[in-house]
Amino acid sequence: MLKVLILKKRKDFVRVAQGLKVAAPGLILQAAQSLSSPHREIPEDGCFLGYTVTKKVGKAHIRNRSKRRLRAAAREVFPDNARAKIDYVLIGRYNTADIEFKKLVSEMKKALCKINKIISEPQDKTDAKKADDIAD
């Protein structure tokens, strides 16, 4: 089981925003490779996870409810499905607070599997060829 730590620094959120992105009906999932820095160490068996909901979603009580629901769903999904040494950011959407919780969990699981698949595949054919050459 993977240890899930909290992403807190703004520069980490900005770095992850430049990485991969998968959209689902109730959330957006972003991911990027973890980088060590003076304010944090990368655990061998862990990943970092951050949450954000913008003011476009609604007033504070709606944004807070959306973040609570994202955290609860992530507690179910991430320990078994996330990859080590990857930083993830969950972004709440306008319907995150209202969507059925089981659907939110299933959409999060699908998005996480999709982004992990993209991470594990080589970026282009030249990378795949280099990987084959190294294997031989």
Sequence positions of predicted segments:
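Positively charged, solvent-exposed patches that mediate nucleic-acid binding
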Residues: 1-136
